[in-house]
C-alpha cells in the first residue's frame, strides 16, 4: 500500500456505497452503519494502490477516477488485465482466501477510493448473504469479459482487436453526446498498444484510419468521439 495516501476531503461514505452494485438493496439505516466502517484515501497518478505479491487487508471501491491492474510478461512487457473506474471494486477475492495479489493496481489519474477492511467485509457477508451472491455475479462478469478479451487477442486481424477495445470503452467510459459517443480514454496510445499486444505506431495508424473513414473523431490524446458505432459493431460480427 502507498504511504503517500491521505484522507479524502471531498467524498462521502454513502456516495461510495450507492455506486457499488453489491450494496444495492440495503436500506438507508444499513447504509449508514456500513458508511461508518469505510476509510477514504487518495492516490496520485502513477501511485500503486497495491502491488503484485502484497497481502491485502481491504476491499477497494473506486469513488472517483480510474486505475489499471497489470503485471509484466516474462519478456518484461506490461500486460494490462483490468481497468477499474468509478463504482468498480476489487480485492474481494483475496479477502476470501489466503492468496497474495496476482497483479499491481496503479492510479491512471488522481483517484479517490473507499476501503473496507477484511474483518468488516467478512462480517457484512455473514450479515447480508445477498452481498455474497452479487460478488459471485460480479466475478462471473469479470471472467466473461476477460475470456472475451482473450478471444479477441487470439484474432490476428488487428482492426478487430481495436474495434473490440473501442466498443468496450464505449460501454464502460462512454457518454452520449449529439455527435455520437464521447469516450474519455483511460489509457494513452502506448497503454492501449500494451493492452492489445501491438506496437504504438500500429494503433496510432489504425485510429487515424478510423478517423479518415468517418467512424471516429479524435478530440485529444485522451478523448475521442465514436461517430458511427454501427460500423464498429458490424466489423466484429461473426468473429468473436
Predicted stretch roles:
Residues 1-45, 90, 94-96:
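Cyclic nucleotide-binding regulatory module and flanking cytosolic helices
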Residues 22, 47-110:
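Cyclic nucleotide-binding regulatory domains
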Residues 82-144:
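Cyclic-nucleotide recognition modules
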Residues 154, 158-161, 165, 188:
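N-terminal positioning helix adjacent to the helix-turn-helix/winged-helix DNA-binding module
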Residues 122-126, 145-155, 175-176:
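Short helix-to-loop capping/linker segments positioned immediately adjacent to catalytic or ligand/cofactor-binding
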Residues 31, 121-122, 232:
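A generic structural signal for short hydrophobic patches within well-formed alpha-helices
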Amino acid at each position: 500500500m502507498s504511504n503517500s495516501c491521505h484522507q479524502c476531503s471531498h467524498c462521502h461514505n454513502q456516495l461510495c456505497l450507492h455506486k457499488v452494485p453489491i450494496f444495492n438493496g440495503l436500506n438507508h439505516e444499513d447504509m449508514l452503519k456500513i458508511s461508518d466502517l469505510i476509510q477514504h484515501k487518495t492516490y496520485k497518478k502513477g501511485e500503486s494502490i497495491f502491488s503484485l505479491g502484497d497481502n491485502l487487508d481491504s476491499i477497494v471501491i473506486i469513488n472517483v477516477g480510474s486505475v489499471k491492474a497489470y503485471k509484466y510478461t516474462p519478456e518484461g512487457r506490461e500486460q494490462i488485465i483490468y481497468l477499474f473506474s468509478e463504482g468498480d471494486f476489487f480485492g474481494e477475492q483475496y479477502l476470501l482466501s489466503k492468496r497474495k495479489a496476482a497483479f499491481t493496481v496503479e492510479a491512471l489519474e488522481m483517484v479517490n477510493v473507499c476501503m473496507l477492511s477484511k474483518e468488516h467485509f467478512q462480517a457484512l457477508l455473514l450479515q447480508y448473504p445477498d452481498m455474497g451472491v452479487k460478488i459471485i455475479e460480479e466475478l462471473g462478469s469479470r471472467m466473461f469479459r476477460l475470456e472475451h478479451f482473450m478471444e479477441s487477442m487470439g484474432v490476428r486481424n488487428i482492426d478487430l482487436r481495436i474495434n473490440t477495445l473501442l466498443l468496450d470503452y464505449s460501454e464502460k467510459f462512454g457518454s452520449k453526446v449529439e455527435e455520437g459517443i464521447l469516450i474519455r480514454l483511460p489509457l494513452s496510445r502506448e497503454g492501449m498498444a500494451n493492452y492489445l499486444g501491438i506496437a504504438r505506431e500500429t494503433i496510432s495508424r489504425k485510429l487515424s484510419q478510423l478517423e479518415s473513414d468517418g467512424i471516429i473523431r479524435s478530440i485529444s490524446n485522451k478523448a475521442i468521439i465514436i461517430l458511427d458505432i454501427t460500423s464498429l459493431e458490424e466489423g466484429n460480427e461473426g468473429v468473436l
